[in-house]
């Protein structure tokens, strides 16, 4: 529907009434009011005029006198709508009852025809005059959801009309934005642009029905912390069903310190009654802002026309305050909040991007691989002893260097999802709950020497290159855009050196491994100890100069989807972050409880925390190539092996004494890899058992005893195998070589008795 300007009820004065004359007229025209003591009190209204009727100073009714231009068919439609809603027992008590039999004409003081209706009065306080709470907001969402559900099955030809307050049809408002100037005009232009993107282009995808169209805070009645009434059906039209929720929110969020909680309360309960789909979610916030636009535009125009009617501007100040607050919150972030509330994936393509990142072979961001260096965890949380004051405190460097010395490292890691107390400025106060701050770290900090070169871990394009030169901000900042298929994600590099501005420019394409900057010093990086703030971003939320490095704790589930853990790219083992073990305590317990015969390798023992594929990872997050353990045949933490073992153990785990298929299947598969002569299998549990059994078979088959072994060999821990192992019998505590054991030199061309410089070195070993 397109709105076309025409002479409407908004263009003429509302009825002008003589109260005494009206009371006499009421007694004549309504039988239930005859012979009664009547008093009337005018209510606030916009285009018509309404009164409370008091009968004998007790019983109350609502008297509605229409605008002279109001058409009777619209009023009859309203009555049909009210009766339809009251036919639902769960809604009946919330909807005013009609007390007029017919709609009667009344002439105002200007002799203009107006129509009169009488409805029941619902006792309570207006939502706009009530301090809201969870219970009120929940009941409001529930009632609106029920109304939307009920109205799905109702239609009326008179509801199909253009209406100036319809937030889904505000093309008319564009020209009126010019009556504003400065920041207000910019806010309205931005809102209109969002309307075109999120509403106008989405209208064909929205569900339509008859809507109340004005569930504002003075059409909602509250009693005992519950909504008890929904008033005024004069704005009801056929429009996108989601309009009612959007309009309700545009008023419920006014003068509200906790926008998030109100959104959550109302939308959650509405969604339980009337399930919101993804297209409606995409339009909801913009529809809410569009209604606020209508409010401020109409208020200014009406105030000029009727300067004495303060009711016409009743919501203007609050609407502007909310528009200014919402303007600071990216609309996509608000959409993500609604998606989470309604149970949808926060970012619909999140999993595709994360799967791509998990599989991609990223390059190093420094000249070296972080996994090949000792690293120290630098906790900057609220209870951390590191931060005794401001982050630029000179003693911080001393405390960090002390940790580096203890860990024999020169690299510090500041944690993702860490709650920090250093973000104290007013710009860190949450717009969604002013009682909370943005204090959860959304990146990983890598503390390293200033001047250290940085390199792109993946191909990209520079889209942000900005010096955010504010205290405790990023300082020189770089953001790269990365594309695959139809998706994009971004990496942010903060606290860099200004030198990058001389060598890089916006739009420059960067190849994996290409230089992208240096670590900045504290005079240029926002007054921080030299480090890199590294962050992954799936949606820039409209930012083109900067991006938040910290988010609200109560919104972390959303921030986590927008800025997932940067360790997806860095790939420092998880055990490094969760390592709470004290090396000295671990070593002490080992020596106390485990025999010294089970020796520990290396003078300074390696404290291993994790293993994956061919690598071990120690407590410093440093990796080691495992060439010792037999597990390297299939790799550590092999998910396929783990899954197969788990599946089998949940079904059956027994020995060779019983008949079952698994052992046969495995035997056939294993034998298929061997020569045909090897056609029988012995199953044992360890290498010692296998070697001992093979030795006994050989003895039995040959009736011989003599054995050739290599020097320094170890074959197992059974008595028979220790006698065959020079590593054991020739070592301290060993019993020496048996006469049937013959030790051969290990043919080592580099360190052996005969070396490759001797052309006959191989023959020497044979001889």
Q: What are these model-predicted stretches?
A:
Residues 668-766:
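PLP-dependent aspartate aminotransferase-fold enzymes
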Residues 350, 359-382, 386, 508-514, ...:
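Acidic, glycine-rich catalytic/binding loops that coordinate metals and/or anionic ligands
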Residues 623-704:
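Glycine-rich loop-to-alpha-helix module at the N-terminal edge of alpha/beta enzyme cores
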Residues 10, 295-348:
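ATP/Mg2+ or Mg2+-diphosphate-binding catalytic cores
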Residues 456-500:
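Zn2+-dependent peptidoglycan hydrolase active-site motif and core
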């Amino acid at each position: 529907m397109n709105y076309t300007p025409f002479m409407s009820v908004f263009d003429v004065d509302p009825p002008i009434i003589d109260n005494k004359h009206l009371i006499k007229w009421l007694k004549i025209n309504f039988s239930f009011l005859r012979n009664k003591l009547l008093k009337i009190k005018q209510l606030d209204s916009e285009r018509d005029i309404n009164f409370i009727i008091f009968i004998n100073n007790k019983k109350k009714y609502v008297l509605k006198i229409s605008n002279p231009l109001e058409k009777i068919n619209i009023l009859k439609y309203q009555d049909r709508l009210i009766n339809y809603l009251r036919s639902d027992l769960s809604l009946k008590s919330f909807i005013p009852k009609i007390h007029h039999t017919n709609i009667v004409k009344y002439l105002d003081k200007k002799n203009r025809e107006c129509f009169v209706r009488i409805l029941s009065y619902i006792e309570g306080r207006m939502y706009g005059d009530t301090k809201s709470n969870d219970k009120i907001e929940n009941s409001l969402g529930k009632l609106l959801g029920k109304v939307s559900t009920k109205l799905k099955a109702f239609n009326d030809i008179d509801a199909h009309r253009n209406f100036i307050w319809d937030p889904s049809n505000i093309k008319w408002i564009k020209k009126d934005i010019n009556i504003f100037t400065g920041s207000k005009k910019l806010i309205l232009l931005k809102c209109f642009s969002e309307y075109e993107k999120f509403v106008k282009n989405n209208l064909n995808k929205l569900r339509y029905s008859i809507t109340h169209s004005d569930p504002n805070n003075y059409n909602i009645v509250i009693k005992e912390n519950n909504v008890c009434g929904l008033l005024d059906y004069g704005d009801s039209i056929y429009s996108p069903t989601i309009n009612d929720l959007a309009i309700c929110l545009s008023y419920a969020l006014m003068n509200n310190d906790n926008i998030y909680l109100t959104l959550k309360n109302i939308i959650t309960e509405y969604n339980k009654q009337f399930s919101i789909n993804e297209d409606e979610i995409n339009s909801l916030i913009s529809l809410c802002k569009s209604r606020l636009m209508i409010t401020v535009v109409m208020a200014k125009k009406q105030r000029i026309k009727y300067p004495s009617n303060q009711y016409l501007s009743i919501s203007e100040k609050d609407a502007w305050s909310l528009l200014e607050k919402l303007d600071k919150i990216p609309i996509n972030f608000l959409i993500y909040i609604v998606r989470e509330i309604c149970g949808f994936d926060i970012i619909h393509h999140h999993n595709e991007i994360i799967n791509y990142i998990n599989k991609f072979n990223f390059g190093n961001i420094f000249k070296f691989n972080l996994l090949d260096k000792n690293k120290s965890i630098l906790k900057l949380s609220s209870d951390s002893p590191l931060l005794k004051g401001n982050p630029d405190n000179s003693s911080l460097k001393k405390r960090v260097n002390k940790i580096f010395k203890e860990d024999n490292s020169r690299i510090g890691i500041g944690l993702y999802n860490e709650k920090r107390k250093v973000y104290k400025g007013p710009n860190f106060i949450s717009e969604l709950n002013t009682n909370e701050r943005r204090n959860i770290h959304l990146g990983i900090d890598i503390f390293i020497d200033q001047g250290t070169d940085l390199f792109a871990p993946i191909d990209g394009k520079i889209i942000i290159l900005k010096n955010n030169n504010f205290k405790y901000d990023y300082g020189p900042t770089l953001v790269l855009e990365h594309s695959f298929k139809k998706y994009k994600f971004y990496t942010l590099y903060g606290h860099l050196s200004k030198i990058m501005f001389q060598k890089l420019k916006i739009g420059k394409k960067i190849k994996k491994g290409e230089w992208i900057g240096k670590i900045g010093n504290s005079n240029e990086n926002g007054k921080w100890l030299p480090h890199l703030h590294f962050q992954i971003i799936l949606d820039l939320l409209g930012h083109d100069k900067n991006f938040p490095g910290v988010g609200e704790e109560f919104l972390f589930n959303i921030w986590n989807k927008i800025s997932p853990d940067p360790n997806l790219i860095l790939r420092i083992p998880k055990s490094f972050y969760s390592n709470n073990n004290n090396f000295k305590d671990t070593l002490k317990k080992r020596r106390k409880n485990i025999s010294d015969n089970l020796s520990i390798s290396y003078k300074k023992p390696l404290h291993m925390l994790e293993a994956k594929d061919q690598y071990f990872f120690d407590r410093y997050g440093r990796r080691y190539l495992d060439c010792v353990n037999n597990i390297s045949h299939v790799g550590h933490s092999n998910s396929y092996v783990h899954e197969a073992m788990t599946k089998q153990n949940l079904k059956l785990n027994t020995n060779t004494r019983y008949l079952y298929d698994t052992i046969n299947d495995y035997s056939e598969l294993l034998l298929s890899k061997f020569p045909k002569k090897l056609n029988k299998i012995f199953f044992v549990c360890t290498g010692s058992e296998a070697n001992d059994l093979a030795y006994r078979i050989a003895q039995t088959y040959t009736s011989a005893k003599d054995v050739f072994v290599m020097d320094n060999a170890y074959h197992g821990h059974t008595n028979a195998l220790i006698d065959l192992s020079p590593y054991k019998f020739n070592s301290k505590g060993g019993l020496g070589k048996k006469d049937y054991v013959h030790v051969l030199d290990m043919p080592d061309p580099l360190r052996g008795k005969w070396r490759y410089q001797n052309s006959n070195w191989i023959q020497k070993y044979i001889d």
